[in-house]
């Protein structure tokens, strides 16, 4: 499988376990645990053979944590997920279908099906279309194009980093 999944966590506990359980075991998962919790690292790596938990020396935030994980990706594609994301069974397959239709893509992101976010369009049959930016809860990357952008700007610790990244990736593929 040509995909590595990166999840940045900070004491996400049971939520993180639910996320990992929703991911096909064939895919390697890098968890960046920003709380530097060695017990969680041991727990994750004992429970899930496909999980490697990395403990940075300090809390790197969302962008820095993702950069650490993405710098270790050796596959052509990476999927970053927030720890509270639960993937539907066909989610990864759908990312690859979209990637095959748009081979020069930079970032592909799903539509949130969480009804409490009323700003989102909940039409489940949306075609892939180019947008200026996406929400950072789940982003599927073409690593070739992402590497050209130098990943996330670590000056953004927790908010707006995905908007900045989207702007830079979009400028590279046009």
Predicted regions span which residues?
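Cell-envelope/extracellular polymer assembly enzymes that use nucleotide-activated donors
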Residues: 2-4, 28, 164
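Short, well-formed alpha-helical segments that are part of the catalytic scaffolds
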Residues: 7-25
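A conserved acidic beta->alpha catalytic loop
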Residues: 22, 33-42
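Short beta-strand/loop segment that forms part of the nucleotide-sugar
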Residues: 27-36, 54-56
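Glycine-rich, basic loop-to-helix element that forms the pyrophosphate-binding segment
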Residues: 56-73
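Short aromatic/hydrophobic "clamp" motif used to bind/position activated sugar donors
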Residues: 78
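A short, conserved alpha-helix in the catalytic core of glycosyltransferases
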Residues: 139-141, 145-151, 155-174
